Amino acid sequence: MKTFRCILWLMLLPLWVMAVADAAAPNMGAVLKNARFISYTPRSFSVVNGQTLPASSEGITEDLKLLRPNFDSLITYSCSNGLDHVPAAAEKLGYLAIIVGIWDPKSEIEIQNSIRLAKKHPKLIIAISIGNEGIYARHYTPMDVEKTYHRIRRELPSVSLTTSEPFFLYLKPEYFDFFNKMDLLLPNIHPTFETWFNPSDAQNAATFVLNVAAKLQSQYPQPLLVKETGLPSGPASTGFTEAHQSAFWAEILKQSAPSETRAVSCFEAFDAPWKPAVTREYFPGSDHLQEAYWGFFTVDGKSKPVVNAIRLIRGKR
């Protein structure tokens, strides 16, 4: 009899462990509907002349305190070079959710850190994003992402896993099977890169983003969170201004309230003067000056008009 009970207990143990993990995991639909996401790279982090300056835990805490009055959820791009400090700082400040990013799906450090962080912060980390536009840039392959996906899944059966690419890859038939394996769609939908784009036409730009999101939802069954979209606030020589940036975000938030199946994350937290040089390495052929100006806050931590614009829209809901 004792032997039978022991065998029964061993058989039920995995189910019990899974149930505990599921109970701790955040509800994706509820988070998408209620969270105020923003993509976040610490101001203390930079890449200059090929040299990476890691983010500091003190700098991260300062950043998250500044963001907290208007945002309660974060999307990061890496979990190495200091960004592994983000979840602990966010938890102390009462953030609702984090989508932890892995920049390089082949990085052993990032893979191990993502697993460790998700286990340590099960109520905070809602998903892990394995890569950002690296398939499009040909820095890694779908097979690389899938390999890391399955490795993390074995360790974290209840955490949503995904990746992030430009929206047009999701619409190519050769990628349908790949993206269908993801638990969440996390596309980047940038109207600024379309040939028809006009910085002063906020309504058309916002409508484009939401139409693309709807098209993706008609193709895939998963919930969708637009990871990147928006307008940079400069440089003025390119036609981008703080007023145009603010108008776009006011328009897209007016047109689309978040739901359990679709939401839009703000992009991004802070200006990053070092990004144009790095972007030129990824995508040569342009100076990419606007990459320094996507922030809702300047590199000095000063809020732009867009912050007040989204606050006013949210206040009317």
Predicted regions and their residues:
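Active-site clefts of carbohydrate-active enzymes
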Residues: 192-193, 218-248, 268-276
